[in-house]
């Protein structure tokens, strides 16, 4: 059988006799074995080789070598040594052969292994020992690995070895697969080898196509499975272990093994072509040897293979499969690059056997451990192994030295001589923690060099490392516990060689791409290119220190997956846990075998065009890069020529990884990142945080401040992101011009992906920016032992690297600057975010890093802002979805992926200023952008309106009303109204006009009417509707027109729908407004219920409104339920449209809609209450998106409904009624920039209209005035027009009916912040100032305000009166127009001088008009609006004026009587409003004036007063003086107060109906204009009384009218009224300290000086107070006037003789005086007339001595 046919990669194996190939081989793990090995001084360093197919003649080629390498391996069994040493061993030639007997007992096997009865495969290890001789460059000599199985596998039903008689050899099955077609053939060489036997005690635990993993059972402990390896050459997929064999002399003489004890370099093997096979202990890890691109054999070249197979503790080898396993390409590459291969034909044949069989791209990783005592290793436990590819430690010595295989590439530590102390040339070769189980690998980016040059550099680098190494002692530790690193469950399935393409990586890739709709062109085919040499020679290995070799960091071995994985280490671990990012294997030939990014050395993302072949080498130098102002680390780049293959691999290599990762991130970047982290954590197991002491340490980062490089696609070339501290950002990164400078790179290299925040804006988003993250670094002292490459480098701050590329291939330099960076890991192509955002702290000087990363939502790392097309609020969206939103698409909040803000009712996340500040956008820039966006979006919005406006109205047809809140009523037989009609004898219909039920609007119930079936009064029940059809009625939407003639009064149809209660109605109304409902379907059913025909109804819902209707609505009682029927008001012809007046059945507070009825008496709006309506629909009915304008007080534009309208300024003329031309013919003056939809535009001087200040949240509206130009120019000065604060420019010059008195008009317009909504004209839309009404004085023109949302209850109506104005109905002219003249901005009565009089006149006329039939409909509605305006009035002066205002002549009703009469009004709304006003403002004792004659009557004295106000402000009916005719400084006498002249308050007098007062003089001081508090000085009681009576100082405007003004709010002051008689209703009893009073009362919450519950506890002093003389008492009172515990007493009504009181101690306190008249009737039991302290026995007056009331205070004291 030919070797080629059996897939043997090495033809030399055919010359070996299988009978002498092997002997019994077993591994003894007990202590005696290693003690003997140590006693011999044997220590074997690592051995590795790349397997390259060789010709058969290579074995026969013999050249005399300098030395011969002999191997001795002892095998112990049951404590006895069965090893045999060759007697011919010498110092130079040591020949060791392990001969085993034919039985298991002769093999050296431990007891534990024998009990386990496990079988282990035999292995042949090929060693290539090359030596440099006298500076000659060696040529790679290729050796091969022959995989065989021992014959003992037959016992486990393994495939039997087949002997080929023709060749005299033995063919052994590969991998134990049981398939005999592919096997390894070994020629017989009986003269060179001894007998081959196997043992039964060792069996394979796992044999897979990727390799084998096995387990040693020692003491019941199972070692870890090491990762299996794939043979890239395809020669064999399995690794087997051979027990023992002897070395032939021909091989030993061929100088294949240069294992001298004195030399540490490789032999020169230029003239040597030979293969050798050496048997090693199973504790050695067998590495598959792969060739590099040029065919050179370099054992250190592991950049393309990093598959791990760890057999602890002797061996640590880490390897990751390279994914570029296109064997056809590899075969071609090997043939071209192989040097000295005289029989490449056989190599091709050998490789062709496995064409189509790629290595498994998702190879599982295994590790194996063997419990070996620490003492046998003789090494320190804490010393980390830093070799990143493989470090093998053998307890055997070759003479006095060892073998060293240098590795100049990728900072991979070479194999070195290991002395007795476990040191490699002065460096500790042992490892601690998990690093001993898994060695760090070299970066996958590094490229192998030519064999000649790499050996030169390899030798020099190795020597330098030997000199610079530091020494460390290792603490003793239980190696058994240390080596337990892997906690993963390994697979135990046996994999055979694939016989079909199914399951192959290429096939899997194709299926995967096809399932994701990704084009697939097959695996790439390209010509191999020779890598370029390392120009820096050995400088790249400078970064090791502290005895650690660079690259010792532990790698995160990803299991299987198809996405970018992040392994994030949390917590503190002494600065030794850098960020670890693992790129998992992806099916296909696009990723490198080294799919692991080494933490602390390389940060790689799958953004490269060809991730596997693109190898850029990063070397730290001292002179490559210097920044001007920022001292940063000098970095240079070396780029391999293979990086030029990007163009070929864009579609397959990098693209596949990006597609795989991007598809996952597209779904949910946040969840995917968490998922990736979790998978990585599961792959690596639970890791300890202590890198030095724990066996499960995550990473031992020995690379100080190592460089992080990143590959990305051709567009960005090979940008460089400095150090692991920099969290990478690659796409859509905002960089400020003043912070970042781009590298010298053409714009096509990706500079367009870095937009500037101040210039580049997406049409729909505020910015394509990111939320700025900060990288924070901890600073520490410089390490004295740091590497020389870091000398002079200052501690780095947060670094942000701009990407760039030089024109040359290498070196490629990226500019590093010290700036804040964004913590987002992005894919270079699709901008997906890996959702890693956090802060990184780093000890830069030591190169040790601690990564504290927090996983956040993707929108926090990189986000943009987009405005909702419905609510116009700005929402945050991921920047990756910005590209999907263009100008033609419509975006609403429901499309937001962030569910927190996926509803228009949700408030904006941030204010506009904060958004602009976050994005670095200035206000002017934002305004300009909004204006530009408005212009761009106008056409799109109008187009979308036309498209959706054609949609038909959808509703559910029902026949009767549906009650949602209750069940339908049904009448009993006793409740049914039965008419007295009799059936007609001639068969005519009964129940005509004379029917009693018909007269009462009650339908006769079927079955109860005497007329029976001939009853005509059952129209609702029988649904006797007329015939009509639905049609499109222009701007009014759908309408209903007749298909037959109709007589007057005929029943047309019932208006049916859903019956809602008031609460449900309000909710439904807001819901419709929120959704943009534009049609009006509400109808009042009764006082508590409303019909909504919007969602459900019949054809009656399509009847439109008209201010001159031809139908009317009537309410009928049908079986106990009220039904609304529509009846004709006149004779109607066929084809005539049916209309009725919506206002008759208007729901109070319903939304107002623009009326398009076109009648001569059109009121302009339908059904809306302008005082407190929520929304006014401004758009036409045929527009699909109603123009909703929020009318509320919320200045931020986020009102109750959360819906605004975006109005633009070009179509005002189109949507204006024809009356626009009638406004004095000034249509041509409307400027283009101030036109507004549905508004009358008037051009004002340019200087008065500054540019609009627009915010992104508010609606973009530039509003104009709709007033008469003549009136503006004639009556309002230009300088005063700019001071107007009215939301509509109508208030700029609000004109009186006669159009005169410009001063009055200007004052009203500028000082009262009146917002007027003209009902006969289209409503003016403008903005409301953000300041209060008082601050608005002197403001700028309102149309240019920032706030663009109109509060509805702030908008009032003002008719535009001019000779050219259209005619309005009398009811509008008399009521609505005049009412609007009287109202202010908040809907209350304005403060103008004539407002009170006009309001009372309007109220009187409206109340009087309710008796007429024509105006009765409007009177009830108008009365409710008048009273509602009164409730909204907040000005005290206005309310007082209205209350005090009398009729124009005697006998006219007063306001009080009018309001009291309205409490018994028939209309429910008027009744409730009047009662509400009465209960709030009119006390009960004023409702019945005759009751105030009774002083102690409980109805009047203990009436419930509004608890918001101080009880002391309650009017007093006893001993109160009327308001004097003129104020006086001092009054010597006072008029006696009478109950008839009792006033509502001290400041004014309310005349009784029986005694009207004709004096209409107003007070000097107004309630809303409090006078200044007079300076506290010595005053008389009369002067205080005068001030109290006339001044009413310190009046609080929030107090109601009709009550006395409060005193100045002084903390310790109390209010008291001295009275001659005790009044039980007074709040404070005499003599009680304030602290005690507070215990019996409840002070007001808003005002501590007021009482919520006034104390009323009577004072009964017991025992009586001690006596005191009058003079002494008052002397002390005068001195302590301000410090008395009672506080200051305020006297308001009682006029007493002058008594000077000095109040100099506390000027803020009111004067405190004493009066003996208080409490004279307090003690009713004793009828005392003097205060208790005056009732003394030693005084001149006794307790029973009365004090006349007409005596002054001095006379009382001196009597």
Swiss-Prot record:
Family annotation (Pfam families): AWS, SET, zf-CW
Enzyme Commission number(s): 2.1.1.-
Organism: Arabidopsis thaliana (Mouse-ear cress)
Bias (Basic residues): 462-472, 758-775, 1317-1326
Zinc finger CW-type: from-to: 859-912
Name of the protein described by the UniProt record: Histone-lysine N-methyltransferase ASHH2
Induction comment from the UniProt entry of this chain: Not regulated by vernalization.
UniProt GO cellular component terms: chromosome, centromeric region; nucleus
SET domain segment(s): 1026-1143
Transmembrane segments: none
Binding locations of Zn(2+): 868, 871, 893, 904
Subunit and interaction comment: Interacts with FRI and SUF4, two components of the transcription activator complex FRI-C, and with SWC6, a component of the SWR1 chromatin-remodeling complex. Interacts with BZR2/BES1 and IWS1.
Residue ranges annotated for the AWS domain, each copy included: 974-1024
């Amino acid at each position: 059988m030919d070797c080629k046919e059996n897939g043997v990669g090495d033809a030399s194996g055919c010359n070996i006799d299988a009978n002498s190939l092997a002997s019994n081989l077993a591994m003894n793990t007990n202590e005696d074995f290693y003690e003997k090995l140590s006693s011999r001084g044997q220590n074997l360093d690592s051995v590795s080789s790349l397997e390259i197919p060789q010709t058969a003649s290579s074995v026969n080629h013999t050249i005399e070598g300098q030395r011969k390498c002999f191997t001795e391996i002892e095998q112990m069994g049951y404590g006895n040594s069965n090893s045999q040493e060759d007697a011919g061993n010498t110092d130079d030639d040591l020949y060791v052969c392990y001969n085993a007997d034919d039985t298991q007992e002769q093999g050296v096997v431990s007891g534990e292994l024998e009990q386990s009865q496990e079988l282990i495969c035999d292995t042949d290890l090929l060693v290539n020992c090359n030596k440099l001789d006298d500076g000659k460059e060696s040529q790679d000599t290729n050796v091969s690995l022959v995989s065989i199985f021992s014959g003992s596998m037959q016992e486990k039903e393994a495939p039997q070895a087949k002997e080929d008689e023709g060749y005299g050899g033995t063919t052994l099955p590969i991998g134990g697969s049981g398939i005999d077609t592919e096997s390894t053939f070994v020629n017989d060489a009986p003269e060179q080898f001894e007998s081959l036997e196997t043992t039964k005690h060792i069996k394979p635990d796992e044999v897979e196509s990727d390799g084998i993993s096995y387990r040693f059972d020692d003491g019941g402990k199972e070692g870890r499975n090491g990762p299996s390896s794939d043979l890239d050459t395809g020669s064999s997929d399995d690794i087997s272990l051979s027990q023992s064999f002897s070395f032939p002399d021909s091989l030993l003489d061929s100088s294949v093994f240069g294992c001298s004890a004195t030399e540490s370099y490789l032999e020169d093997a230029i003239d040597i072509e030979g293969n050798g096979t050496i048997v090693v202990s199973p504790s050695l890890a067998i590495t598959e040897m792969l060739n590099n691109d040029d065919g050179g054999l370099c054992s250190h070249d592991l950049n393309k293979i990093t598959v791990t197979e760890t057999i602890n503790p002797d061996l640590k080898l880490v390897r990751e499969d390279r994914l570029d396993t296109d064997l056809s390409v590899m075969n071609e590459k090997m043939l071209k690059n192989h040097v000295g291969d005289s029989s490449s034909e056989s190599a091709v044949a050998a490789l062709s056997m496995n064409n189509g069989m790629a290595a498994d791209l998702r190879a599982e990783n295994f590790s194996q451990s063997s419990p070996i005592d620490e003492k046998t290793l003789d090494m320190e436990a804490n010393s980390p192994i830093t070799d990143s590819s493989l470090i093998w430690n053998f307890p055997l010595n070759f003479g006095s030295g060892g073998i060293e295989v240098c590795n100049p590439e990728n900072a991979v530590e070479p194999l070195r001589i290991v002395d007795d102390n476990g040191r490699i040339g002065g460096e500790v070769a042992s490892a601690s923690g998990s690093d001993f189980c898994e060695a760090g690998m070299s970066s996958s980016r590094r490229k192998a060099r030519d064999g000649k040059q790499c050996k030169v550099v390899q030798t020099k680098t190795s020597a330098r490392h030997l000199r610079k190494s530091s020494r460390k002692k290792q603490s003793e530790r239980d190696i058994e516990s240390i080596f337990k690193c892997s906690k993963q469950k390994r697979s135990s399935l046996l994999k055979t060689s694939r016989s079909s393409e199914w399951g192959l990586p290429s096939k899997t890739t194709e299926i995967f791409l096809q399932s994701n709709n990704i084009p697939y062109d097959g695996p790439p085919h390209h010509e191999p290119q020779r890598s370029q040499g390392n120009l820096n020679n050995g400088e790249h290995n400078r970064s090791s220190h502290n005895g650690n070799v660079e690259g010792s960091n532990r790698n995160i071995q990803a299991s299987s997956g198809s996405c970018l994985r992040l392994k994030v280490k949390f917590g503190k671990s002494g600065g030794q846990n850098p960020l670890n990012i693992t790129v998992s294997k992806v099916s296909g030939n696009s990723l490198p075998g080294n799919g692991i990014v080494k933490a602390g050395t390389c940060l790689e993302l799958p953004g490269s065009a060809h991730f596997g072949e693109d190898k850029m080498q990063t070397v730290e130098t001292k002179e490559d890069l210097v920044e001007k102002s920022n001292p940063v680390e000098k970095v240079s780049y070396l780029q391999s020529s293979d990086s030029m293959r990007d163009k070929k691999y864009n579609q397959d290599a990098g693209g596949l990884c990006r597609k795989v990762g991007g598809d996952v991130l597209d779904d949910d970047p946040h969840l995917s990142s968490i998922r990736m982290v979790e998978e990585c954590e599961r792959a690596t197991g639970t890791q300890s945080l202590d890198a030095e002491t724990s066996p499960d340490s995550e990473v031992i980062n020995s690379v100080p401040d190592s460089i992080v490089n990143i590959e990305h696609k051709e567009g960005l070339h090979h940008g460089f992101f400095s150090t692991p501290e920099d969290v990478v950002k690659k796409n859509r990164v905002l960089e400020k011009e003043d912070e970042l400078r781009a590298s010298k790179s053409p714009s096509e290299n990706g500079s367009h992906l870095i937009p500037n925040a101040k210039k580049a804006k997406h049409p729909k988003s505020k910015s394509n920016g990111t939320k700025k993250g900060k990288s924070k670094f901890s600073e520490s002292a410089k390490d004295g032992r740091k590497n020389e490459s870091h000398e002079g480098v200052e501690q780095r701050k947060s670094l942000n690297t701009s990407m760039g590329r030089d024109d040359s291939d290498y070196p490629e330099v990226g500019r590093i600057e010290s700036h804040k960076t964004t913590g987002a890991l992005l894919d270079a192509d699709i901008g997906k975010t890996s959702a890693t955002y956090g802060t990184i702290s780093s000890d830069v000087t030591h190169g040790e890093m601690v990564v504290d990363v927090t996983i956040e939502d993707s929108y926090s790392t990189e986000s943009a802002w987009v405005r909702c097309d419905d609510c116009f609020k700005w929402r945050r969206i991921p920047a990756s979805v910005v590209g999907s939103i263009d100008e033609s698409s419509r975006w609403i909040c429901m499309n937001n992926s962030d569910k927190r803000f996926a509803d228009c009712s949700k408030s904006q996340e941030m204010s506009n200023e904060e958004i602009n500040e976050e994005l670095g956008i200035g206000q002017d820039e934002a305004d300009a952008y909004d204006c530009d966006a408005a212009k761009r979006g106008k056409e799109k919005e109008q187009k979308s309106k036309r498209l959706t406006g054609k949609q038909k109205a959808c509703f559910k047809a029902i026949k009767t009303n549906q009650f949602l809140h209750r069940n339908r009523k049904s009448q009993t037989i006793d409740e049914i109204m039965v008419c007295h009609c009799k059936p007609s004898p001639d068969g005519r219909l009964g129940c005509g006009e004379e029917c009693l039920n018909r007269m009462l609007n009650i339908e006769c119930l079927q079955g109860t009417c005497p007329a029976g079936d001939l009853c005509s009064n059952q129209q609702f029940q029988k649904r006797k509707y007329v015939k009509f059809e639905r049609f499109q009625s222009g701007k009014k939407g759908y309408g209903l027109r007749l298909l037959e003639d109709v007589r007057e009064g005929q029943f047309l149809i019932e208006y049916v729908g859903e019956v809602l209660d008031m609460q449900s109605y309000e909710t439904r109304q807001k819901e419709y407004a929120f959704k943009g409902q534009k049609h009006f379907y509400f109808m009042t059913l009764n006082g508590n219920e409303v019909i909504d025909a919007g969602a459900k109804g019949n054809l009656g819902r399509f009847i439109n409104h008209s201010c001159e209707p031809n139908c009317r609505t009537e309410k009928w009682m049908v079986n106990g339920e009220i039904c609304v029927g529509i009846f004709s008001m006149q004779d109607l012809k066929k084809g005539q449209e049916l209309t009725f007046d919506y206002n008759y059945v208007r729901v109070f507070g319903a939304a107002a809609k623009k009326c398009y009825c076109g009648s001569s008496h059109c009121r302009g709006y339908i059904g809306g209450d302008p005082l407190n309506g929520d929304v006014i629909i401004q758009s036409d009915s045929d527009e699909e998106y109603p123009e909703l304008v929020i009318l509320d007080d919320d200045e931020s534009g986020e009102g109750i409904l959360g819906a605004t309208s975006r109005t633009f300024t070009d179509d005002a003329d189109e949507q204006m009624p024809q009356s626009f031309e009638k406004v004095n013919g000034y249509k041509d003056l409307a400027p283009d920039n101030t036109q507004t939809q549905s508004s009358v535009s008037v051009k004002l001087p340019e200087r008065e209209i500054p540019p609009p200040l627009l915010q992104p949240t508010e609606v973009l509206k530039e509003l104009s005035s709709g007033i008469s130009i003549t009136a503006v120019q004639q009556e309002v000065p230009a300088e005063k027009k700019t001071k107007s604060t009215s939301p509509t420019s109508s208030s700029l010059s609000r004109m009186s009916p006669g159009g005169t008195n410009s001063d009055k008009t200007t004052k009203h317009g500028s000082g009262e912040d009146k917002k007027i909504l003209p009902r006969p004209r289209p409503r003016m839309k403008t903005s409301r100032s953000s300041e209060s009404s008082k601050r608005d004085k002197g403001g700028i023109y309102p149309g240019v305000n920032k706030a663009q949302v109109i509060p509805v209850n702030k908008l009032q109506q003002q008719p535009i009166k001019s000779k050219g104005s259209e005619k309005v109905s009398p009811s509008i002219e008399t009521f609505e127009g005049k009412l609007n003249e009287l109202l202010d901005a908040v809907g209350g009565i304005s403060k103008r001088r004539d407002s009170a009089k006009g309001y009372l006149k309007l109220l009187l006329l409206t109340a009087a008009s309710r008796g007429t039939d024509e105006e009765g409909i409007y009177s009830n509605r108008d009365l409710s609006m008048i009273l509602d305006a009164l409730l909204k009035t907040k000005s005290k002066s206005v309310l007082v004026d209205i209350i005090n205002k009398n009729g124009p002549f005697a006998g006219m009703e007063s306001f009080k009587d009018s309001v009291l009469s309205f409490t018994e009004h028939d209309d429910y709304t008027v009744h409730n409003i009047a009662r509400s006003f009465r209960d709030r403002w009119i006390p009960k004792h004023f409702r019945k004036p005759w009751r105030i004659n009774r002083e102690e009557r409980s109805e009047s004295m203990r009436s419930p007063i509004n608890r918001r106000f101080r009880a002391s402000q309650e009017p007093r009916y006893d001993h109160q003086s009327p308001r004097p005719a003129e104020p006086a400084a001092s009054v010597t006498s006072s008029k006696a107060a009478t109950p008839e002249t009792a006033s509502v308050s001290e400041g004014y007098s309310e005349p009784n109906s029986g005694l009207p007062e004709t004096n209409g003089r107003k007070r000097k001081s107004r309630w809303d204009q409090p006078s200044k508090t007079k300076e506290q000085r010595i005053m008389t009681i009369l002067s205080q009384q005068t001030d109290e009576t006339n001044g009413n100082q310190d009046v609080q405007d929030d107090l109601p009218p009709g009550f006395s003004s409060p005193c100045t709010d002084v903390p310790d002051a109390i209010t008291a009224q001295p009275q001659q008689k005790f009044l039980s209703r007074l709040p404070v009893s005499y003599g009680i300290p304030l602290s005690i009073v507070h215990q019996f009362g409840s002070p007001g919450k808003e005002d501590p000086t007021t009482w919520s519950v006034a104390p009323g506890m009577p004072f009964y002093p017991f025992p009586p107070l001690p006596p005191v003389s009058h003079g002494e008492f008052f002397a002390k009172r005068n001195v302590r006037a301000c410090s008395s515990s009672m506080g200051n007493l305020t006297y308001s009504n009682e006029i007493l003789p002058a008594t000077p009181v000095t109040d100099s101690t506390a000027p803020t306190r009111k004067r405190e005086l004493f009066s003996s008249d208080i409490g004279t009737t307090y003690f009713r039991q004793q009828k005392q007339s003097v205060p208790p302290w005056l009732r003394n026995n030693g005084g001149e007056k006794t307790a029973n001595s009365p004090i006349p009331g007409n005596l002054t205070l001095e006379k009382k004291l001196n009597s």
